[in-house]
């Protein structure tokens, strides 16, 4: 009897560990519970913005003129965590369109890696520009881009594509453009959030990015958090750092308010 009880405990324990591991690998855990603040009542739902491509659009319920933010997902795709973050940002008085660059959500890191590797960058930029136009047509007087990881790089790619923005936010986007020549098109403030243990974006690369922005006279805020690695703001990842995530989000809100509302 005791052996049977022990066996059941082992099986249940193993199942729990597998569940936790799967949750960490799929990007489906959320930040919104920790970052939630009292704010405006918002409306959110799926909407077509680029042909048949549907994103998630969140905006304040009260009518008004609100700035817009193009929100760009990580390599997982447009999952529930990103949709919740869109609603959380909308509470602060923004029209937020969380784009979909893949058309599906990856279930494993291998799937995420494959869909990122197969991205058509030209089409991705068309997608992002359509999102920018959507927000302007919705009445946003100013538009910013904000992305994490894969989306962080795409946030910068949009900024240097020739489209007019009013602010750019990048969370640890690997493969960043760092040269003066490539960053020349940017004419607005940039916020960069990074970790000094991020092997995919060495501190030297971040400093090169910052130096080029300074050389071009582009107002910028670059933060490198000590002791944290890549995707530290992703609650599904092994590198998740809650306190740094809260601080980075507070800095993001302050930056957007300064750049878009004041």
Outline where the language-model segments fall:
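Gly/Ala-rich beta-loop-alpha elbow adjacent to hydrolase catalytic centers
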Residues: 147-151, 155
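Serine-hydrolase catalytic machinery in alpha/beta-hydrolase-like enzymes
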Residues: 28-136, 234-236
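Alpha/beta-hydrolase fold nucleophile elbow
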Residues: 136-148
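Acidic catalytic loop of the alpha/beta-hydrolase fold
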Residues: 197-201
């Amino acid at each position: 009897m005791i052996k049977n009880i022990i066996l059941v405990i082992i099986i249940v324990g193993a199942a729990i560990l597998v569940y936790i591991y799967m949750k960490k690998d799929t990007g489906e855990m959320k930040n919104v519970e920790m970052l939630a603040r009292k704010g405006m009542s918002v409306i959110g739902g799926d909407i077509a913005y680029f042909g048949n491509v549907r994103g998630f659009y969140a905006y304040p319920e009260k009518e008004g003129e609100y700035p817009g933010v193009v929100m760009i997902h990580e390599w997982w795709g447009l999952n529930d965590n990103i949709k919740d973050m869109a609603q959380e940002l909308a509470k602060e008085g923004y029209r937020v369109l969380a784009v979909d660059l893949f058309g599906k959500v990856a279930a494993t890191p291998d799937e995420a890696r494959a869909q990122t590797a197969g991205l058509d960058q030209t089409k991705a930029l068309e997608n992002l520009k359509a999102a920018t136009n959507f927000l302007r047509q919705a009445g946003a007087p100013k538009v910013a881009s904000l992305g994490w990881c894969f989306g962080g790089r795409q946030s910068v790619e949009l900024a240097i594509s020739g489209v007019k923005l009013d602010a750019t936010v990048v969370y640890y986007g690997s493969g960043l453009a760092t040269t003066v020549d490539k960053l020349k098109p940017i004419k607005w403030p940039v916020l960069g959030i990074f970790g000094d243990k991020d092997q995919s974006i060495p501190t030297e690369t971040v400093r090169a990015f910052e130096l080029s922005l300074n050389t071009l006279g582009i107002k910028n805020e670059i933060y490198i958090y000590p002791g944290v690695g890549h995707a530290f703001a992703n609650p599904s990842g092994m590198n998740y750092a809650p306190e740094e995530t809260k601080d980075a989000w507070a800095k993001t809100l302050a930056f957007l308010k300064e750049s878009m509302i004041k």
